[in-house]
Amino acid sequence: MISKKLTTALLILFTSFSFAQEEPSVEKSIFGIQTGILGVWVHNEARLTNSIALRTEIGLDFGINGNDNTTTTALIPSIRVEPRWYYNLEKRIAKNRKIANNSGNFLALNVTYNPDWFYISNRENINVISTVAFIPKWGIKRTVGNHFTYEAGIGLGGFIVLEDYETDTNVALDLHLRIGYTF
Protein backbone atom coordinates (compact mmCIF):
# COMPACT_ATOMS: atom_id res chain seq x y z
CA MET A 1 0.00 0.00 0.00
CA ILE A 2 2.81 2.42 0.91
CA SER A 3 4.73 1.60 -2.25
CA LYS A 4 1.59 2.23 -4.35
CA LYS A 5 1.07 5.66 -2.71
CA LEU A 6 4.79 6.45 -3.05
CA THR A 7 4.74 5.46 -6.73
CA THR A 8 1.65 7.60 -7.35
CA ALA A 9 3.18 10.60 -5.53
CA LEU A 10 6.46 10.28 -7.46
CA LEU A 11 4.59 9.96 -10.76
CA ILE A 12 2.61 13.15 -10.04
CA LEU A 13 5.77 14.97 -8.94
CA PHE A 14 7.77 14.03 -12.06
CA THR A 15 4.80 14.81 -14.32
CA SER A 16 4.44 18.28 -12.82
CA PHE A 17 8.16 18.95 -13.32
CA SER A 18 8.00 17.86 -16.94
CA PHE A 19 5.19 20.35 -17.66
CA ALA A 20 6.80 23.24 -15.77
CA GLN A 21 8.48 25.46 -18.32
CA GLU A 22 11.12 27.97 -17.49
CA GLU A 23 10.59 31.46 -18.83
CA PRO A 24 13.26 32.39 -21.40
CA SER A 25 15.82 34.70 -19.86
CA VAL A 26 19.03 36.52 -20.67
CA GLU A 27 22.18 35.15 -19.05
CA LYS A 28 22.95 36.19 -15.46
CA SER A 29 26.38 37.55 -16.45
CA ILE A 30 28.48 37.31 -19.61
CA PHE A 31 32.09 38.46 -19.98
CA GLY A 32 33.72 38.66 -23.40
CA ILE A 33 35.89 40.42 -25.94
CA GLN A 34 34.89 41.71 -29.37
CA THR A 35 36.58 43.23 -32.37
CA GLY A 36 35.39 44.82 -35.55
CA ILE A 37 36.54 47.20 -38.26
CA LEU A 38 36.17 50.14 -35.86
CA GLY A 39 38.01 48.91 -32.74
CA VAL A 40 38.40 46.36 -29.96
CA TRP A 41 36.38 46.08 -26.72
CA VAL A 42 36.00 44.12 -23.47
CA HIS A 43 32.42 43.81 -22.22
CA ASN A 44 30.12 42.43 -19.57
CA GLU A 45 26.36 41.89 -19.81
CA ALA A 46 24.50 41.58 -16.51
CA ARG A 47 20.86 40.51 -16.24
CA LEU A 48 18.47 43.14 -14.87
CA THR A 49 15.23 41.28 -15.75
CA ASN A 50 14.45 38.19 -17.83
CA SER A 51 14.63 40.21 -21.05
CA ILE A 52 16.83 43.21 -20.12
CA ALA A 53 20.61 43.16 -19.70
CA LEU A 54 22.97 46.00 -18.86
CA ARG A 55 26.03 45.93 -21.12
CA THR A 56 29.13 47.74 -19.89
CA GLU A 57 32.14 48.03 -22.13
CA ILE A 58 35.61 49.54 -22.34
CA GLY A 59 37.72 49.59 -25.44
CA LEU A 60 39.40 51.49 -28.22
CA ASP A 61 37.33 53.11 -30.98
CA PHE A 62 38.87 53.69 -34.41
CA GLY A 63 38.72 57.13 -35.98
CA ILE A 64 39.84 58.52 -39.32
CA ASN A 65 40.22 62.08 -40.55
CA GLY A 66 41.59 63.23 -43.86
CA ASN A 67 42.10 66.12 -46.21
CA ASP A 68 43.95 66.68 -49.49
CA ASN A 69 47.41 66.22 -47.98
CA THR A 70 47.14 63.81 -45.03
CA THR A 71 45.03 61.09 -43.52
CA THR A 72 45.06 60.62 -39.76
CA THR A 73 43.95 57.39 -38.10
CA ALA A 74 43.63 56.93 -34.35
CA LEU A 75 42.44 54.60 -31.63
CA ILE A 76 40.84 56.47 -28.72
CA PRO A 77 39.44 55.07 -25.45
CA SER A 78 35.71 54.49 -25.08
CA ILE A 79 33.54 53.68 -22.09
CA ARG A 80 30.05 52.46 -22.93
CA VAL A 81 26.92 51.70 -20.88
CA GLU A 82 24.05 50.17 -22.81
CA PRO A 83 20.80 48.75 -21.44
CA ARG A 84 19.52 46.16 -23.93
CA TRP A 85 16.00 44.75 -24.24
CA TYR A 86 16.13 41.33 -25.91
CA TYR A 87 12.59 41.27 -27.25
CA ASN A 88 12.38 37.98 -29.14
CA LEU A 89 13.70 35.33 -26.70
CA GLU A 90 10.36 33.49 -26.47
CA LYS A 91 10.00 33.43 -30.25
CA ARG A 92 13.54 32.01 -30.61
CA ILE A 93 12.79 29.26 -28.07
CA ALA A 94 9.53 28.40 -29.88
CA LYS A 95 11.54 27.96 -33.11
CA ASN A 96 14.20 25.84 -31.32
CA ARG A 97 16.88 28.51 -31.78
CA LYS A 98 19.65 29.32 -29.31
CA ILE A 99 19.39 32.08 -26.74
CA ALA A 100 22.73 31.18 -25.12
CA ASN A 101 25.06 34.15 -24.55
CA ASN A 102 22.03 36.43 -25.11
CA SER A 103 21.49 35.47 -28.73
CA GLY A 104 18.54 37.48 -29.97
CA ASN A 105 17.33 40.76 -31.39
CA PHE A 106 17.57 43.80 -29.14
CA LEU A 107 16.69 47.46 -28.72
CA ALA A 108 19.22 49.51 -26.76
CA LEU A 109 20.19 52.96 -25.59
CA ASN A 110 23.91 53.34 -26.21
CA VAL A 111 25.64 55.91 -23.97
CA THR A 112 29.33 56.28 -24.90
CA TYR A 113 32.00 58.46 -23.35
CA ASN A 114 35.13 59.09 -25.44
CA PRO A 115 37.66 60.87 -23.20
CA ASP A 116 40.81 62.61 -24.36
CA TRP A 117 43.05 60.64 -21.95
CA PHE A 118 45.36 59.20 -24.62
CA TYR A 119 45.39 58.07 -28.23
CA ILE A 120 47.25 55.71 -30.53
CA SER A 121 47.76 57.34 -33.93
CA ASN A 122 49.86 57.44 -37.08
CA ARG A 123 50.49 61.17 -36.40
CA GLU A 124 51.81 63.17 -33.46
CA ASN A 125 49.93 65.89 -31.57
CA ILE A 126 46.40 65.26 -32.78
CA ASN A 127 43.46 66.92 -31.05
CA VAL A 128 41.08 64.38 -29.47
CA ILE A 129 37.80 65.95 -28.37
CA SER A 130 35.97 64.43 -25.38
CA THR A 131 32.38 63.53 -26.24
CA VAL A 132 29.35 61.76 -24.80
CA ALA A 133 26.95 60.13 -27.28
CA PHE A 134 23.33 59.03 -26.71
CA ILE A 135 22.14 56.68 -29.44
CA PRO A 136 18.99 54.53 -29.48
CA LYS A 137 19.65 51.50 -31.65
CA TRP A 138 18.46 48.14 -32.94
CA GLY A 139 20.71 45.10 -33.21
CA ILE A 140 21.09 41.35 -33.41
CA LYS A 141 23.46 39.07 -31.54
CA ARG A 142 24.09 35.42 -32.38
CA THR A 143 26.23 32.64 -30.94
CA VAL A 144 28.21 30.21 -33.09
CA GLY A 145 29.19 27.09 -31.17
CA ASN A 146 29.46 27.70 -27.44
CA HIS A 147 31.66 30.79 -27.17
CA PHE A 148 31.96 32.67 -30.47
CA THR A 149 29.51 35.50 -31.18
CA TYR A 150 28.76 37.99 -33.89
CA GLU A 151 26.56 41.03 -33.68
CA ALA A 152 25.37 43.86 -35.86
CA GLY A 153 23.50 47.03 -35.00
CA ILE A 154 22.42 50.42 -36.23
CA GLY A 155 21.26 53.57 -34.49
CA LEU A 156 21.02 57.32 -34.89
CA GLY A 157 21.32 59.81 -32.05
CA GLY A 158 23.33 62.76 -30.89
CA PHE A 159 26.49 63.63 -29.05
CA ILE A 160 27.71 66.38 -26.77
CA VAL A 161 31.17 67.91 -27.04
CA LEU A 162 32.57 68.39 -23.54
CA GLU A 163 34.80 71.35 -24.44
CA ASP A 164 33.48 74.92 -24.45
CA TYR A 165 34.41 75.85 -27.99
CA GLU A 166 31.61 74.06 -29.82
CA THR A 167 27.87 74.61 -29.42
CA ASP A 168 26.49 73.05 -32.60
CA THR A 169 23.98 70.22 -32.59
CA ASN A 170 25.80 67.02 -33.40
CA VAL A 171 24.38 63.88 -35.00
CA ALA A 172 25.93 60.48 -34.29
CA LEU A 173 25.50 57.28 -36.29
CA ASP A 174 26.21 53.94 -34.62
CA LEU A 175 26.77 51.22 -37.20
CA HIS A 176 28.60 48.19 -35.92
CA LEU A 177 29.57 44.72 -37.06
CA ARG A 178 31.57 42.72 -34.53
CA ILE A 179 32.84 39.24 -33.84
CA GLY A 180 33.76 38.08 -30.37
CA TYR A 181 34.43 35.41 -27.78
CA THR A 182 32.56 34.93 -24.49
CA PHE A 183 34.13 33.25 -21.48
Where are each of the predicted segments found?
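Transmembrane beta-barrel domains of outer membrane proteins
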Residues: Q34, H43-E45, R84-Y86, G139-K141, ...
